[in-house]
Regions:
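Alpha-helical transmembrane bundles and membrane-interface segments of multipass inner-membrane proteins
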Residues: 1-183
Length: 183
């Protein structure tokens, strides 16, 4: 069972990194910055638009993306460490950790190899604002961003269903200290 979870973690992580990088490469090869493509039943609601994000998620902290490089390494390292340390975790948590690592690594690849351009973003959702009767643009995002967002929701749900126990594993508990009354 433990090895199945490890395989699942690595498959989720590797497949989503490859998917993220392939879509980013396709968009960079077929669209110019700011150019959009939209079609089918989602026309006007969902667009593929090439943008570069030099900040963090959803375009915040523009120019502050450099700090995300070490943070991405820490996040990916945390996910990998956790999956090896807690191999008995649920399937849900295993998938979430794979998505978390892949999202961090996917955007890290962009930061390292795109350098000055930043992270490639491409998915644009236009959401209806019923108060003002117009469409509002949701910040442009990519597969890696989606992986991180979905992973965080999954982990929060997993943690709420299985809160961290205060019980100490008997194998890890320290030996009791017996005081010598003669001392």
């Amino acid at each position: 069972m433990k090895s199945k979870r490890l395989v699942m973690f690595w498959v989720v992580m590797v497949v989503t990194i490859i998917l993220d990088q392939m879509i980013k490469a396709w968009v960079r090869g077929h669209l110019n910055v700011g150019q959009s493509w939209s079609g089918g039943p989602w026309h006007g609601i969902f667009e593929i638009t090439l943008t570069y994000n030099k900040g963090i998620a959803f375009g915040m902290l523009q120019g502050g993306g450099l700090i995300m490089t070490p943070i991405a390494v820490i996040i990916a390292g945390y996910a990998i460490f956790t999956i090896y340390r807690n191999r008995g975790e649920s399937t849900w948590a295993t998938i979430a950790l794979g998505l978390l690592a892949s999202g961090a690594i996917g955007n890290l690849i962009d930061r390292v190899f795109n350098g000055k351009d930043g992270v490639t973003d491409m998915f644009l959702l236009r959401l209806a604002n019923i108060t003002h009767g117009k469409m509002n643009d949701f910040p442009v995002f990519n597969i890696a961003d989606s992986c991180i967002s979905v992973a965080m929701v999954m982990l929060l749900i997993s943690w709420s269903k299985n809160p961290v126990s205060d019980k100490v594993d008997p194998k890890l508990a320290p030996e009791p200290v017996i005081e010598d009354p003669a001392v």
